[in-house]
């Protein structure tokens, strides 16, 4: 009876009014995760010309303002870490916190006024991140920490004029930083669950506050393929960042981890909606990784899908030859073939990605060439965890 009544009401409602054109599925734009060094004047000029989004450290306010002056359309986000406080030189100056922090809460501020915000293990020791000296895990599940972090960061964004925040370490597991079990939890799984739930709360509190102020929140979401719905939930404000995009997993299968679980499906839905940013990073040690990263990003083509290759130190701005490919606009959705290969046709070319562990024979559309202008055979052997990026050949007269 209730179902029938609901259907009657729904049927009487007018069709939704379309107020604007559908978002254009454009080839990936470029962005710069510029947190490894102070940008030089020529890098700032380059960034203003080439990048849609730039992320800088909190103390780079002059660079941020220059970017806005050179290109008012570029989005400049400030780097802030959700999960740690830090006491290495630069984050602290002697026995006090620096004026501009890579985190939301300063080390000495927490040490002197809220020491309970430092997470401790079952031996009551503070948790320092392995491989990252003087990075200390914080109690992201504590409502008081969450509020203090959000209040401080939102105030700084508004005061300095940033477009928003890139919130790092929105992670799913502590294991990449420490083997510690957090006090009050029974095991590593319990610790991870506590952290995930805490970060859910931090995201909501900070995201709501920034959104109300007309500012952006883009978290760096990791391991979202392990938890269905996590990417969609954590990209719901201004988008999300994926720092290990298009790379092979470490499980020994040789497959691309990006395509596992529900993450890629959620990213496709976000890109198709076209309302928020997908900021994708591929750490490239070879041409193959660069090719796979770009082609995988092209499968997610949309008005706010940006990709970059990078070195883990993030000291330099990067540009890829694939970003000069001029793929144009996608003319179809990304298609998954029975073989497991994904393909997508663009107005200026075609991409194919093989995320599987087996080679696959693919048939590209006619009239394509490599980026070097070389002719392409009717069929191509696409190796495992590899990709093709092909462009339209010269028009026949």
List the predicted regions and their residue ranges:
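Glycan-processing catalytic domains of CAZymes
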Residues: 13-397
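Boundary at the C-terminal end of the N-terminal hydrophobic targeting segment
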Residues: 9-11
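Bacterial N-terminal signal peptides
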Residues: 1-6
């Amino acid at each position: 009876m209730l179902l029938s009544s609901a259907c009657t009401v729904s049927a009487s409602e007018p069709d939704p009014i379309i107020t604007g054109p559908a978002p254009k599925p454009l080839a990936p734009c470029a962005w710069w995760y510029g947190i490894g060094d102070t940008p030089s004047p020529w890098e700032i000029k380059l960034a203003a010309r080439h990048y849609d989004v730039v992320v800088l450290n909190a103390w780079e306010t002059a660079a941020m303002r220059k970017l806005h002056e050179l290109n008012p359309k570029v989005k400049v986000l400030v780097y802030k870490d959700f999960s740690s406080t830090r006491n290495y030189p630069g984050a602290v100056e002697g026995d006090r916190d620096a004026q501009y922090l890579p985190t939301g809460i300063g080390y000495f501020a927490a040490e002197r006024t809220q020491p309970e915000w430092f997470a401790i293990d079952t031996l009551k020791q503070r948790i320092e991140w392995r491989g990252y000296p003087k990075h200390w895990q914080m109690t992201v599940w504590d409502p008081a920490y969450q509020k203090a972090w959000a209040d401080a960061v939102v105030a700084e964004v508004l005061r300095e004029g940033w477009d928003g925040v890139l919130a790092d370490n929105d992670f799913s597991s502590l294991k990449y930083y420490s083997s510690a079990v957090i006090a009050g939890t029974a095991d590593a799984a319990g610790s991870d669950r506590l952290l995930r739930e805490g970060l859910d709360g931090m995201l909501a509190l900070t995201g709501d506050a920034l959104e109300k102020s007309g500012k952006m929140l883009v978290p760096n979401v990791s391991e979202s393929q392990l938890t269905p719905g996590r990417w969609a939930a954590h990209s719901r404000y201004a988008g999300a960042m994926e720092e290990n995009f298009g790379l092979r997993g470490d499980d020994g299968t040789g497959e691309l981890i990006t395509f596992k679980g529900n993450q890629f499906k959620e990213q496709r839905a976000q890109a198709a909606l076209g309302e928020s940013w997908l900021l994708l990073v591929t750490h490239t040690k070879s041409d193959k990784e660069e090719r796979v990263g770009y082609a995988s990003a092209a499968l997610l083509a949309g008005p706010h899908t940006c990709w970059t290759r990078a070195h883990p130190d993030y000291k330099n701005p990067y540009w890829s030859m694939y970003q000069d490919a001029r793929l144009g606009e996608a003319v179809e959705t990304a298609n998954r073939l029975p073989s497991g290969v994904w393909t997508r046709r663009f107005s200026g070319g075609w991409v194919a990605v093989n995320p599987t562990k087996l080679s696959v024979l693919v048939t590209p559309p006619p009239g394509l060439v490599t980026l070097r202008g070389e002719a392409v055979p009717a069929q191509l052997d696409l190796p495992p965890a590899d990709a093709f990026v092909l462009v339209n050949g010269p028009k026949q007269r």
